[in-house]
Amino acid sequence: HNEDFLGHVLPSSPAQVQSQGWLFALADGVGGQERGEVASRLAVETVQAGFRKIPKGIMHVSLLPRLVQEANHAIVDQGHAAPHRSDARYSDPGGAILPGGSQMASTLVLCALRFDSAVVSHVGDSRCYLARNGNLTALTHDHTMVDEQVRLGLISKTEAASGANRHILTRALGSELFVAADTITVNIMPGDVLLLCSDGLHGYVSDASIQQIVASTPDLDQAAAALVAAANAAGGYDNVSVQLVRVRSVERMGLYRGRPYRLL
């Protein structure tokens, strides 16, 4: 069964375009025996419900970390993650290992769009990329043991790709009573493509290959199919989930005109 879950919230009126904007979410559950599937679905649905109820005009940069924490609480409250942790780690069939001995958890990456900005907030190793003018930029960094070692200069990216600790998550929803989300704001431009994906894609397909596929495939449905096919061809055994969003137009003064995003 697929332990990934995708979701989005689109504005239903011109007023909501300005007051709410757009939200896109992707979660990759961990735990096996359907625990991961429950966790990822609960994470996305909790975030969707919270986003629909946001006060008018609230800043996404403060909202998204709060929604991540609400999703974390929902998973903890489900009763599958105890508040007191041991040092043991749990490995699920997909290979991911959770921090703190948790047996039900999920990654989560969110991208909210309004005016000329994209706010990205995440926990775990699900990613968000920005594709622009033939270049691909990662807007997130993985919360894994090897990624932290790379940032500290202890190992190289090549060593990390095959390292024994590459599946050990240092942060995940449901692993603790509080989880810290990393949040970033970037400007967006017409023609930009935002890509949310699970490690079922980036764990098997290089950033260069992802960039080439997105840049050479204008149709988002075909691009998504090509990305999944590339992951499978590379021997991917994990769930592969991809969400692509194209920015059609941006109004810097506070209005989007028309339907600015092409959602897959």
Describe each region flagged by the PLM:
Residues 1-264:
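PP2C/PPM-type serine/threonine phosphatase catalytic domain
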